[in-house]
Design a protein with these regions (language model features):
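Terminal low-complexity "docking" segments
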Residues: 2-156, 170-181
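Short, hydrophobic/amphipathic alpha-helical patches that form generic packing surfaces
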Residues: 160-171
C-alpha cells in the first residue's frame, strides 16, 4: 500500500510541477516559443538528448576549470559529479533530461532573459537522477558560492550553457507533446 501512496504522491508532484511549468512558459516570448517549436518538429529525440548531455558535459568542464583556477576542486567535487553523470547516461541516456525538464522549465522565462538575480535566487531543490542509485546533480548552495568566484567570462560561458540546457529541455517537452498527440 505504501508503494501506491508513493506513486500517487509522485504523480501529484509531477502534475503540480507541470502546472507551474505551463504557467512559466506562458511568460516566455512568442518568438522564442515558436523557434523552440520548430526545433521540436525538426529534431529527432536522440539529437535533443545527445545535445543536452553534451552541453551538460561542457558545463561540468567549465565548472572544473573554475574550481582548478581557484584551487577548490576537493571542496566542490565537480569531477565526481561529472563521472557520475557519465555513468548515468551510459545506463540511461535520457534520464538527465527527463529529470531536469520540469525543474528547469519552471524558470525558463528568467533563464532566457538572462535575469541573473532571479536565476541565482530561484528555489531549486537538490535534484536526484535515478539510475539504480541516487546522486545530486544540482547543489545550489555550492553553486552560488562558486558563482561569486567566477570571472565575468566564466559566468557568460556558464549562462550560455544554462540557456542551451533550458532550450533543449523546452524542445524535449514540446517534442513529447507532439509525439503524444
Amino acid at each position: 500500500m505504501a508503494n501506491n501512496n508513493g506513486e500517487i504522491s509522485g504523480a501529484k508532484d509531477r502534475r503540480l510541477r507541470l502546472e507551474k511549468v505551463v504557467a512559466a512558459l506562458e511568460k516566455v516570448g512568442r518568438e522564442t516559443k515558436e523557434m523552440i517549436f520548430r526545433m521540436a518538429q525538426n529534431m529527432r529525440d536522440s539529437e535533443i538528448i545527445y545535445l543536452f548531455n553534451q552541453t551538460t558535459f561542457d558545463l561540468f568542464n567549465i565548472l572544473q576549470l573554475v574550481t582548478k583556477r581557484i584551487n577548490t576542486e576537493d571542496i566542490y567535487g565537480i569531477s565526481g559529479y561529472k563521472s557520475l553523470f557519465e555513468n548515468a547516461i551510459k545506463i540511461n541516456a535520457h534520464a538527465p533530461i527527463d529529470q531536469f525538464t520540469l525543474f528547469i522549465l519552471e524558470y525558463a522565462a528568467d533563464i532566457y532573459s538572462q535575469n541573473e538575480d532571479l536565476f541565482l535566487n530561484m528555489a531549486i531543490p537538490d535534484v536526484n537522477v535515478t539510475v539504480g542509485n541516487y546522486f545530486g546533480i544540482i547543489r545550489v548552495d555550492f553553486f552560488r558560492k562558486l558563482w561569486e568566484k567566477m570571472t565575468n567570462d566564466e559566468r557568460e560561458m556558464f549562462k550560455d550553457k544554462i540557456i542551451l540546457l533550458t532550450t533543449f529541455a523546452h524542445t524535449y517537452l514540446y517534442q513529447s507533446i507532439l509525439r503524444n498527440r
